[in-house]
């Protein structure tokens, strides 16, 4: 069957897919992960449909907080799994994401919202 969309494991991979698709005259939604500033530009320019912000800084901070509490006094997390809500960034909420990146808070606070 024909390929109708591509979800890449990272924005860097999505950039490569976009170049190959464009060189071959193919148009389809391409989605990456990481919310790199270059991905926001690619979304604005119509070369990438979306990126997903996963907040790696918040992931590592949360993991370290859990580890340090356990090492300090044996405190275990209330829940076995800790979930952070990723944000899908598209043209619809791109302005919010760009403002957050400009302010330097995209990864620290998770502010790009629809």
Give the positions of each predicted feature.
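Sec-exported extracytoplasmic/periplasmic mature domains
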Residues: 1-2, 18-26, 44-48, 65-72, ...
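Short, charged, surface-exposed secondary-structure boundary motifs
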Residues: 39-43, 60-63
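Structural detector of well-ordered beta-strand residues that form the stable sheet scaffold
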Residues: 7, 29-31, 49-52, 89
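Hydrophobic alpha-helical
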Residues: 1-42
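Hinge/cleft segment of the Venus flytrap/periplasmic-binding protein
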Residues: 58-114
């Amino acid at each position: 069957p024909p390929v109708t969309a591509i979800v890449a494991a990272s924005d860097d991979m999505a950039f490569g897919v976009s170049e190959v698709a464009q060189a071959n005259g193919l148009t389809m939604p391409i989605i990456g992960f990481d919310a790199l500033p270059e991905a926001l530009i690619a979304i604005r320019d119509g070369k990438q449909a979306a990126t997903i912000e996963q907040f790696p800084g918040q992931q590592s901070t949360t993991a370290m907080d859990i580890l340090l509490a356990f090492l300090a006094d044996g405190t275990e997390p209330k829940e076995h799994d800790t979930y952070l809500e990723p944000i899908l960034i598209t043209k619809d909420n791109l302005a919010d994401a760009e403002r957050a990146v400009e302010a330097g808070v995209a990864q620290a606070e998770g502010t790009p919202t629809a």
